[in-house]
Amino acid sequence: GAVKQFWTDVIWGDVDYMFVDMPPGTGDVPLTVLQSLPVDGVVVVTSPQELVSLIVEKAVRMTEMMPRKVPVLALVENMSYFKCPDCDKVHHIYGESHIEEIAAAHGVDTVCRLPIDPTIARAIDAGEVEKLPCDELAAIAEKLLAL
């Protein structure tokens, strides 16, 4: 299929890290990637909704069931919370997080939470995400680079 063709027909050169952004869940694309590409680990990105947590749990279990178990390097929760810029109060707009429970159940040591932050959206839209002074993003990058 398209995933295998993408992997075999592109001259990748010398690559230290490759991130493959996939649809959530355990469908054909994630299964093909895990079975066909030389995957050393996965970073699972989620959000705090209950249904999403169930899907992520299933996807993490799928990595464990591969003939060559693929380790989950980190769980990253996107849109985890909103911190009011006026009063610093944290609001869990999409509900409470389940990321710690999933991490504990599957032995994932690295857990990161990204806030809902209009500054991040503006930086991405402007093509200037690398200039973004975001402690949460810096912490995630440092954790992943240390793996």
Regions found by a protein language model. Give the residues of each.
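Switch II (G3) loop of P-loop NTPases
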Residues: 2-32
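Short amphipathic alpha-helical segments
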Residues: 31-34, 56-57, 87-88
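Amphipathic alpha-helical transducer elements in NTP-driven molecular machines
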Residues: 3-4, 50-57, 96, 134-141
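C-terminal lobe/tail of nucleotide-utilizing enzymes
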Residues: 64-147
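Conserved catalytic network of the ASCE P-loop NTPase/AAA+ motor domain
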Residues: 9-13, 35-38, 65-68
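ATP-dependent NMP and nucleoside kinases share a basic, alpha-helical "lid"
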Residues: 26-41, 50
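Conserved phosphate-donor/acceptor-positioning beta-strand/loop module used by diverse small-molecule
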Residues: 40-49, 76, 114
